[in-house]
């Protein structure tokens, strides 16, 4: 007997297989780029959220803490990895900021002046304030990262004569963030490690002296992962340090709201980048799976007619954080995906069950209905 139900089921399976095959053509690099993009947007959105809700002074304090924490975690270890330890300190610091930022997708130029003085100039568009975001960020952010990172290089290198001189900033409408590392001929007081000299201009750019990472070691895949990790680190550290400034409750409230808004806003863009569809439960699961795979985590799908469970193992976003920090970051970050699935034409509910929180085998079961 001819069965319409059987034909519909067969067509459903065929359609599902077709969608899965289409998504399978998307490369790992596509997934990694999608994750880098949405985490970059989340950090930008979080900055605007705090700037508009909490004001310039909170922003300055927060950014100081973000960059000091990143400096203490990354500077010396990355300094050695980039092979800069043999260079004079001013030269090494300038090259470090060019290399580390270029690896993260940020354009920075290097202009050596002497063994004791070397310039860096950040080129537009600025990653930190991409797009129109630059118009909503107060100058206190610039002062926060200058004091949090640039003015601390000499301390980390145990060179009391090394300081940073800023000649141009982004929010002042000059020619963008620019300045130089200089080893003075005297020990600097704490308030002298960072200074300003707006009347100075950098030397001309010379392409032949720009530092670069070894191409054999830094493949395209490794660079894409570094770009993703760069954005994710700003989100992780941003949320952890924000709690130090405005407290846990407000951080969770504003961090979650920013995440949900970015998820809502960026679903279509990231879905299209992954060749996905704005369709049924299976489409929602394929989208979420592809995005989470872009983090380098292991992901699988269990589904029935009424719901789908996406299982994520590894949870890179909370890796190496303390138990309290892990919970804070996850509680905010999960709303990226809650917002994304709410943005579908048929709105999908997403519930996260976070297991083994304090272990390397941390697992999340994402229930989609």
Task: Spell out what each predicted region is.
Residues 1-119, 126-144, 155-176, 182-369:
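N-terminal accessory segment detector
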Residues 145-149:
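Elongated alpha-helical scaffolds
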């Amino acid at each position: 007997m001819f069965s319409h139900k059987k034909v519909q089921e067969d067509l459903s399976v065929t359609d599902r297989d077709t969608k899965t095959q289409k998504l399978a053509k998307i490369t790992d690099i596509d997934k990694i780029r999608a994750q880098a993009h949405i985490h970059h947007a989340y950090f930008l959105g979080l900055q605007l959220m705090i700037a508009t809700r909490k004001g310039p002074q909170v922003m300055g304090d927060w950014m100081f803490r973000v960059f000091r924490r990143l400096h203490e975690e990354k500077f010396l270890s990355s300094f050695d990895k980039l092979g800069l330890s043999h260079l004079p300190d001013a030269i090494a610091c300038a090259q470090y900021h060019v290399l580390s930022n270029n690896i993260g997708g940020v354009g920075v130029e290097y202009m050596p002046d002497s063994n004791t003085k070397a310039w860096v100039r950040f080129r537009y568009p600025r990653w930190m304030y991409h797009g129109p975001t630059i118009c909503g960020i107060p100058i206190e952010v610039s002062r926060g990262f200058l004091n949090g990172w640039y003015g601390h290089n000499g301390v980390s290198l145990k060179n009391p004569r090394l300081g940073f001189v800023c000649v141009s900033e982004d929010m002042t409408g000059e020619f963008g963030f620019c300045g130089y590392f200089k080893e003075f001929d005297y020990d600097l007081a704490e308030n002298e490690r960072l200074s300003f000299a707006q009347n100075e201009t950098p030397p001309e750019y010379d392409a032949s002296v720009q530092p670069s990472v070894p191409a054999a070691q830094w493949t395209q895949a490794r660079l894409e992962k570094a770009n993703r990790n760069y954005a994710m680190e700003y989100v992780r550290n941003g949320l952890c340090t924000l709690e130090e400034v405005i407290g846990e409750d407000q951080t969770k409230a504003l961090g979650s709201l920013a995440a949900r808004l970015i998820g809502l806003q960026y679903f279509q863009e990231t879905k299209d980048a992954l060749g996905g569809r704005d369709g049924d439960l299976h489409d929602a699961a394929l989208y979420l799976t592809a995005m989470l795979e872009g983090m380098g985590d292991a992901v699988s799908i269990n589904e029935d007619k009424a719901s789908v469970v996406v299982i994520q193992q590894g949870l890179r976003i909370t890796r190496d954080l303390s138990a309290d920090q892990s919970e804070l970051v996850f509680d905010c970050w999960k709303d990226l995906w809650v917002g994304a699935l709410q943005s579908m034409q048929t709105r999908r509910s997403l519930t996260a069950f976070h297991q083994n929180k304090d272990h390397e085998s941390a697992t999340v079961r994402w229930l989609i209905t």
